[in-house]
Amino acid sequence: MKIYAFADEANPSVDGQIAAMTRNGLNGLEIRGVDGTNVSEISLEKAQEVRAKMDAAGLETWSIGSPIGKIDIEKDDFQAHMDKFRHTLEVAKILGAKNIRLFSFFIPEGKDAAPYKAEVIRRLKCFVEAAAGTGIDLCHENEKGIYGDIAVRCLEIHQEVPELKAIFDPANYIQCGQDTLEAWTMLKPYVKYMHIKDALTDGSVVPAGKGQGNLPAILKDFQAQGGCQLTIEPHLAVFAGLKELEREGDTSVVGRYVYESNEVAFDAACNALKEIL
């Protein structure tokens, strides 16, 4: 099993992230925060600098933890977002990433998601078309507030856009009231990799195996079907950049467990996964 992480949760600097991955014996990075800047906004020169550091450390950039698709489907400019996606593709090529994580657009609060399905699918197909021939897989993550927040709508996405792979995030399903075993049964044929994040029914994030995510059972089945890549996404402490990941007005529920630093919280998340495996 190859284990990667959102190491920006340990340290905002690339050097600090490399140190955190190295001391925990990880294979590499799902890159998101780069010296305080989101990976989708760094220059190509900066991407080359990061690639050189990762290569020197013997680490791989497995996936781009991009914010693509995390815009309001009604209010925000999709063409500008497509430009950001094309730039993110160029960054991914330089970093040698095999995947780009993306989302299926925020649905206006209080509105039914169903009427937005056709537009969600159209936009996701635009991303697929732009990435064709690059050798980079586009991977949809289930997330609170987007079209693909619950399993049945994620299934629709993968049936309509078969080129998209799935990222299975147990904690995000719990925070949407979705049973994770039901979601896993529906979506496992589409899952390329998992985000290792667990939660309690009140939504608070806890170390892997300590919540209601059914991680031991799902991980066992994932391995049995040939799954061999995981990304640790701790969310056990407030870290630089957390606020930018949330929809305006939302807050992440962290802090059920208390850690003296982000580094300690990151190491705890790594150890929790190793205990399950």
Task: Describe each PLM feature range.
Residues 1-15, 40-48, 80-85:
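N-terminal-biased segments
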Residues 9-11, 33-35, 67-70, 104-108, ...:
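Active-site-proximal loop/turn and secondary-structure-junction residues that shape catalytic pockets
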Residues 15-19, 53-56, 73-166, 175-177, ...:
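Active-site acidic/histidine proton-transfer and metal-coordination neighborhood
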Residues 70-78, 205-209:
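The substrate-binding groove and active-site-proximal loops of carbohydrate-active enzymes
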